[in-house]
Amino acid sequence: MNIEEIQSMWEQDSVIDDNHLGEASTDTAKVHAKYIKLMVQVKLRLTKSRAEYNLLRKNKFKYYRGELSREELVGLGWEPYQLIKPLKNEMDEFLQGDQDLINLNTKIEYLETMGYLLEGILGQIKARDWQLKNGIEWKKIGRAHV
């Protein structure tokens, strides 16, 4: 599931038919369950990705310092680092420029954006009952004046 798919689903799910406000009201729980399930999945993926990032960062730190054993390098599928070992004050620059870490950080930021989108959708779903109630009241008032 990606952001565009979630947005597309919400475009369909957010539509409230004025002629079927009662049905829309009873559908709110189903719609909420759908998006809360997505939110939980995204949060779990985000937690896993953050843990992967921390482990990769630790291994990259050791890699650039030349502290990984031959077995660890083989297990990670990396060649030994052949350049000059960076000083401690240079290490952040090395890690920030590492493509593997950049890729994983990009994934984390994408998942955070998905979470932000889902939080917004869930907020709208919470407000939906209020909107439906107002719509029903408005229709009652309109009928009373006819």
Regions found by a protein language model. Give the residues of each.
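Terminal low-complexity "docking" segments
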Residues: N2-I3
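Short, charge-rich amphipathic alpha-helices with coiled-coil/heptad character
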Residues: Q7-V40
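Amphipathic, heptad-repeat alpha-helical/coiled-coil signature enriched at exported N-termini
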Residues: Y35, M39-V42, N105-E109
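Long amphipathic alpha-helical coiled-coil segments
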Residues: L46, R50-L55, L95-W138
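Short, glycine/alanine-rich amphipathic alpha-helical segment
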Residues: E72-E112
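Acidic, proline/serine/threonine- and glycine-rich low-complexity intrinsically disordered segments
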Residues: K140-G142
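Conserved small/polar residues in nucleotide/adenosyl-binding loops
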Residues: A144-V146
